[in-house]
A protein has these predicted regions:
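Intrinsic disorder/low-complexity segments
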Residues: 23-33, 54-56, 105-117
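Histidine-anchored nucleotide/phosphate-binding helix
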Residues: 44-53
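Reductase modules of NAD(P)H-dependent flavoproteins
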Residues: 66-110, 114-185
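Extended, positively charged loop/linker patches that create polyanion-binding surfaces
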Residues: 38, 48, 147
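FAD-binding FR-type
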Residues: 1-34
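Short, glycine-rich nucleotide/cofactor-binding loops
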Residues: 33-42
Length: 185
């Protein structure tokens, strides 16, 4: 068990598993990326923000959490891009309400001339809501699913995800999927 390990002990690690986010292709239009992080879903998105910024892609980050003390990675995101916005359900920090409400607000106040790609990780309800908004606006939306991955190699079938092309495994085929490919519960 990991808690019994001491500094210098050796451990076996399996990973990373599955696939990650796909960065925008170079196109004639100037792409922009909107990263939306809900709760602990912020952690896997920091590196993405850094990579997008390195590629000179305009990047906006939206972070949502229940309360101020549950906001994660804000400083890390701000190192990658100056455009970081926060919302809390209870209004203790940033905008009050769900991050999806903040997403609507940002879309109304930012230029729409950009090809927009949305990257999102967080609770399932938030993912579905953001995916619906993206579908309405015809934005590409990539979601990182927070599924329980017991074995991590596709044997246990504990992370089955329903898609338009049949069942897939979050550990092998994901955890990142195009939102339009998923069948939401």
């Amino acid at each position: 068990i990991l808690s019994n390990k001491k500094e210098g002990d050796k451990i076996d690690v399996l990973g990373p598993l599955g696939n990650g986010f796909t960065l925008p292709r170079t196109t004639n239009s100037e792409p922009r990326a909107i990263i939306i992080a809900g709760g602990i879903g912020a952690a896997p998105l920091v590196y993405l923000a850094e990579e997008l910024t390195k590629k000179k892609i305009k990047t906006i980050v939206l972070i949502g959490a229940k309360t101020k003390n549950l906001i994660l990675c804000e400083k890390d995101f701000k190192k990658a891009t100056p455009e970081v916005y926060v919302s809390t359900d209870d209004g203790t920090y940033g905008s009050q309400g769900f991050v999806s409400k903040l997403f609507h607000k940002i879309l109304k106040t930012t230029e729409s001339k950009f090809e927009t790609i949305v990257y999102v990780c967080g609770p399932h309800g938030m993912l579905k809501c953001i995916a619906d908004i993206c579908q309405e606006r015809k934005f590409e939306c990539q979601v990182s699913l927070e599924e329980k991955m017991a074995c991590g190699i596709g044997v246990c079938l504990g992370c089955v995800v329903k898609t338009r092309s049949g069942n897939k495994l979050a550990c092998k085929d994901g955890p990142v999927f195009n939102a339009s490919e998923l069948i939401w519960p």
